[in-house]
Amino acid sequence: MKPGKPRGTGGGKMARIHSHERQWVGALLLVGFWALAVAAPVEANPYLTKPGETRTAVKIGTCAVTGGFIHLYAAVENSLFEKYGLKAEHVFNRGSSISLAALASGENQFLYCAADATIPGMATGLDIKLVAAPLVGLPYVLITRKDIRTLEDLKGKALAVTRPGDLTYRLTKALLKKFNFGPDDVKMRPVGGSQPEQYQAMVADIVQGTVIVPPLDVRARHDGFNVIYHLNDLDLPFIYSSVHTNSQMLKEHPGIVQKVVAAMAESLYFVEKNPDKAKAALAKVLKLDDLEALQSAYNAFTKDLVNRRLTIPANAVAETVEVARENGTDVKRKPAELFENSFAENLEKSGFLKELWGGEIPGKKK
């Protein structure tokens, strides 16, 4: 008998055994791949609350009442934070200075505000950082009374601002500088409050114009007032609605920070896919039932300005700090010390964003 040739039926039996083994191995591999495929979405969203996990209470302040915060309003109203193990309380603050103070003291754990309004204050030494930027761009317009139809008509008039140094003040100052108005040509009058109060000051002719964001532009037109300038044409670096937190949260509770950022990322998707629910949340906060105005706000803040990756553009932070320095701010912190992109970057690295959007993330990187 030649070497290697099986004797009798033993070789055939062994061959059948090896064949069965290969089938079992193949089946096990198939089951393994299937299990991985099923588990992948769970792994891609590691931030969801787990069974039996106690929700963590957090306070999220806002610095104004505006259509630009539609994503936060929708997240709170539709319990998105609860999915991530958070019991979020929305706290209304008035103005960036008050809001930053509440965050720095620990009264609030998070702040949702236009970063351009907060960066100058943060740069003076406040131990606060930006951790996500859902909206990037400048949505403001200048509205004026009926007799003011052009920028030239502003001479001898007054424009409302919240308070000296605040965002409306700096935007109005940049606008007047752009068109060579001197300090005696157009006055900036602090009226406090938020955009609705500034609008009412214009209605009462205490001032003759103010910078606002949608949906107040629709109301202004309905009331016979004019929209005479879109501030996006100033070509200023501008980071709008952003998530802020303090050093204590970053050091002691980074997991909670990550969950808040994840919830806000989902809110971008939710608002885009559920316009009626988003507008209902906005209507509740703004106490507004004008469907045209609500649609105006929805269009303004859910399309061109949306930054689905939530990363903070470093160049815009640096330019905003430089503008603040030129305007007399005592800058004590470097631009890179004012933001932390790791939480937003984790969403993409983990596969969370790809799963959320069902593939490639829409839109360009900002």
Mark where each language-model region is:
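Bacterial N-terminal signal peptides that target proteins for export
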Residues: 4-8, 13-28
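Bacterial N-terminal signal peptides
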Residues: 26-38
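Bacterial Sec-dependent signal peptides at the C-terminal "C-region" and cleavage site
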Residues: 36-46
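Short, glycine-/small- and polar/acidic-enriched structural segments
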Residues: 44-204, 208-214, 227-237
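A short small-residue
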Residues: 45-48, 241-248, 301
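Pocket-lining segment of extracytoplasmic ligand-binding domains
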Residues: 116-117, 188, 196-287
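Secondary-structure end/capping motifs
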Residues: 251-333
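Conserved C-terminal helix/tail region of periplasmic/extracytoplasmic solute-binding proteins
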Residues: 322-366
